[in-house]
């Protein structure tokens, strides 16, 4: 490992306080057309970056942008990926969008989120979809100047995440 991860100065953040969260398109893959496929279709699978098909662009429906993070809310619960290309989603796929964050920063968040989800949530018991937009929190590194007893999202150390993932 190039950069050992120091977790001594981390804080807990509600995901909906630091990113824009949506429940995806909720499209039915079996009803998608495949005449001129040009858009990735992300479902609840934990394989292939969550991409389970390649479908036609839908008139009037813009795909989510490349760089958005997808989170399986069912199926392979908690599978988290940064999407490399524009995409649509199936049912029970959350989409997380950050403003002005690098690919590496988003990859860091995706790894942390995947770990949190794999330890705290499961299908049919404590389902993540009940928490996704309401109270899902993740630990993130804080700047060295942050007060551990009183911090906010401006104290998140995004540069540290970039360094660790480089």
Regions found by a protein language model. Give the residues of each.
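An amphipathic, hydrophobic-aromatic interaction surface with interspersed Lys/Arg
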Residues: 135-147
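Non-catalytic DNA-recognition/assembly elements of restriction-modification systems
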Residues: 1-26, 33-49, 145-166
């Amino acid at each position: 490992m190039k950069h050992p991860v120091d977790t001594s100065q981390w804080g807990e953040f509600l995901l909906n306080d630091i990113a824009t969260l949506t429940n995806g398109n909720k499209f039915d893959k079996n009803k998608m057309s495949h005449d001129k496929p040009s858009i990735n279709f992300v479902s609840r699978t934990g394989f292939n970056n969550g991409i389970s098909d390649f479908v036609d662009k839908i008139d009037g429906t813009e795909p989510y942008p490349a760089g958005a993070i997808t989170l399986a809310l069912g199926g392979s619960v908690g599978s988290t990926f940064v999407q490399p290309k524009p995409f649509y989603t199936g049912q029970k796929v959350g989409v997380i969008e950050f403003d002005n964050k690098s690919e590496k920063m988003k990859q860091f968040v995706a790894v942390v989120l995947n770990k949190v989800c794999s330890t705290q949530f499961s299908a049919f018991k404590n389902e993540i979809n009940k928490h996704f937009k309401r109270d899902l929190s993740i630990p993130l590194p804080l700047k060295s100047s942050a007060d551990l007893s009183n911090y906010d999202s401006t104290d998140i150390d995004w540069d540290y995440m970039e360094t660790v993932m480089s």
